[in-house]
Amino acid sequence: MKFFALFIYRPVATILLSVAITLCGILGFRMLPVAPLPQVDFPVIMVSASLPGASPETMASSVATPLERSLGRIAGVSEMTSSSSLGSTRIILQFDFDRDINGAARDVQAAINAAQSLLPSGMPSRPTYRKANPSDAPIMILTLTSDTYSQGELYDFASTQLAPTISQIDGVGDVDVGGSSLPAVRVGLTPQALFNQGVSLDDVRTAISNANVRKPQGALEDGTHRWQIQTNDELKTAAEYQPLIIHYNNGGAVRLGDVATVTDSVQDVRNAGMTNAKPAILLMIRKLPEANIIQTVDSIRAKLPELQETIPAAIDLQIAQDRSPTIRASLEEVEQTLIISVALVILVVFLFLRSGRATIIPAVAVPVSLIGTFAAMYLCGFSLNNLSLMALTIATGFVVDDAIVVLENIARHLEAGMKPLQAALQGTREVGFTVLSMSLSLVPVFLPLLLMGGLPGRLLREFAVTLSVAIGISLLVSLTLTPMMCGWMLKASKPREQKRLRGFGRMLVALQQGYGKSLKWVLNHTRLVGVVLLGTIALNISIPKTFFPEQDTGVLMGGIQADQSISFQAMRGKLQDFMKIIRDDPAVDNVTGFTGGSRVNSGMMFITLKPRDERSETAQQIIDRLRVKLAKEPGANLFLMAVQDIRVGGRQSNASYQYTLLSDDLAALREWEPKIRKKLATLPELADVNSDQQDNGAEMNLVYDRDTMARLGIDVQAANSLLNNAFGQRQISTIYQPMNQYKVVMEVDPRYTQDISALEKMFVINNEGKAIPLSYFAKWQPANAPLSVNHQGLSAASTISFNLPTGKSLSDASAAIDRAMTQLGVPSTVRGSFAGTAQVFQETMNSQVILIIAAIATVYIVLGILYESYVHPLTILSTLPSAGVGALLALELFNAPFSLIALIGIMLLIGIVKKNAIMMVDFALEAQRHGNLTPQEAIFQACLLRFRPIMMTTLAALFGALPLVLSGGDGSELRQPLEITIVGGLVMSQLLTLYTTPVVYLFFDRLRLRFSRKPKQTVTE
């Protein structure tokens, strides 16, 4: 009592304490960063290596494998995957959460250095690494377009000036430039002209290489002067290469222009980028794993005016995609919902107490508790994100509960005629332990969440801590500020209510009287209620499950997968066709895409949807609509998926979820992967089934006749060099410019490589100087070859990706895949497992039951300690089954799967619904100890006296949650599962626990009496 009196009789100190809490919270709020979700990105590093012209199998065996063996020794690597395609290898390293990305980068560089001696000597550069996850959607896409500059020149501006500057911005992890390649001088050889002049391709390559040399020439000096020697040893443009003499034939000079077409072009002509049907260069910006997306985007936007000044005015620099607007809109929705929730909660208090003065008290207590929480969030390094703001919204119902219990009890004494200060002291003393029990038993609910490991633990930590801090501050405010304000603001009289509120008061009295009559009947018919309770507990609801609610971020990402033998020209046409279909959709605002590079038959598209208030469909509905139109395009597929704020793993795939097949036997993997993929494609629980295994690419297999080659004076190296010179876009020389270095690229003119007959026109100069046609010593035949070779760890791997059809959940898909694998009888040499988000879902499902049991056990222990009883905690926890059933029924009603967010709702219900039981049990025990009442009389009186605060706290929680349930703006799909579970659980538990709690209380009392052989007592009227 002295503790309460200290604050009641010292109002100035109490007010200043509350002001201090509020000011600290305001300061913390201003410094908190903004993010869509808590920081849960895995540290990911991507290693890239290239060997132009090398086949995927060559890249896998000679480049990927040595690097993997070295990189696999790094501590903290949780997953290592690689993909090798034509001339390129990419290795993705995913590290444990607690691994520092900078320390990991140093280890990666050391591993690359250690493997350098095992790599092919012909690699043009050392392997490089980037601290970014290539599977993440870019946080921003910039486009460069121009009516006067070529694509190569635009690419040069982007890669030389823009990308390095953007990479230096804090938070940027990687800037990927696509849509073309650097400028180059391209030499397109004419085979017949070379044959007529007796010039080999190696002669041309050597002549060009020797004619463009950058070497130091030294200096001259005399006694007084020094002269630097400079020569015209470099050729920089196509016009300068055109007259280059490469050979003499019968005394006549053969110039390069006589046997080739020389143009100023680009290094790789098999690249294309577009934005809204216009050729463009794309700058795809990804953030560092630990970076804040909003801060990074803001920094990039602030830099854009400066970047615009560094490029010519004829180049148009635009933002094609920015993920931050929907994030900001989502957070604004939650903030508005929080304000509405506070207003509704205060309205509930006003309706029940029907006093403006009394309503002011929780109207002050709630903001103080919530605002003060921001200070703790800042000290903990948290951010303002959807989950932390949802925690504060939910906390609105919790923090007002404490104030309501204290306020209502003090108001009851005032209505009985007690003086304000005495009523404040007496009322707070009576419910102080109750409020303490309610708060202390609520916080332990979140301990299991705090102890969770991996992604779910990281994701829920901010939510749990934020809510716990808000409850702690609320406990302090309810026992200090609330009784002080009651003692000094309220009067010792019945509240004078307005006429329009009298009807509500009469309704409340009638409701309480009706409850009292029904409760008397229930207490004399406990077996019937027991049957209802047991039936409720036994109800088992099968509900679909998923990892995280499918978000509508306003951004779609699409992967194009075409026939494996498609040409680049045809693939570029597919990109244009798909972009037109999507651009014509009324819900689409912007479309960008690119194709080419080492994967000729694939491409990527990024689609920005119109804001939510300008479209009526969700992202998934738009995907479903587009899927029908896109399926009509022959020879290629475009797989669309909505970009999510959480994406696990480093695999680049064409769908949201992955199932990986591993085998040490590559032949077995290639045999079984098509069977498994075709089976999964027939399952109704899956959509957009596709695979990264591409082993049916068209190949021309040349077989050398070595005996004939030896007889003709030709070696294998000369023959291979011929093929590389002719068809490999071989980089044969370097052009040095002040800002960058450019290449001279040689190949047979594409006009002469349109079909297989191009091989018949190739010839090799033998050791006698004679031109020997390739067909003299080689035979060729078409065959199939892999377009890519994939590894996970050191095993061959193939990843099957899939999306979920509308109405299906991840648990449905998971079970269907397991059944399909069993039905197919896949041998033990081929192992299947979920990857990425699907893998985390499996791990989370396995731990959910344990989490709920741990939360209940923790609450039981705390309640047992507080009440010094093994029995009373069971009475209080008997409210949980009905709440759980109500939550699951509500999810079924709204057709919402059980996700990680719904799990939070179940955990919260454990803390919410037991408050009603605590208020009943606490007053019943007090009445038995000090009022000499029988257990039946005590629990009956407790139920009646606590009916009003129980209704107030429950309705406050309901009204606090309703805005989130009913909100339909940005991010609503993330918030609604939490509120659906809470509202459903509260409604069900409120209907049942007002009756089941007193019945359970009496059941345990009778059990105690039976063991102590005391006579049974009956209800007294």
Swiss-Prot record:
Sequence similarity: Belongs to the resistance-nodulation-cell division (RND) (TC 2.A.6) family. MdtC subfamily.
TM regions (residue ranges): 3-23, 333-353, 360-380, 387-407, 431-451, 463-483, 849-869, 893-913, 949-969, 980-1000
Places the protein is found: Cell inner membrane
NCBIfam families xrefs: PRK10614.1 (NF007905), RND_permease_2 (NF033617)
Membrane topology: Multi-pass membrane protein
One Pfam match: ACR_tran
Kinase in keyword set: no
Name of the coding gene: mdtC
Name of protein: Multidrug resistance protein MdtC
Organism: Shigella flexneri serotype 5b (strain 8401)
UniProt xrefs under InterPro entries: AcrB_DN_DC_subdom, Acrflvin-R, Multidrug-R_MdtC
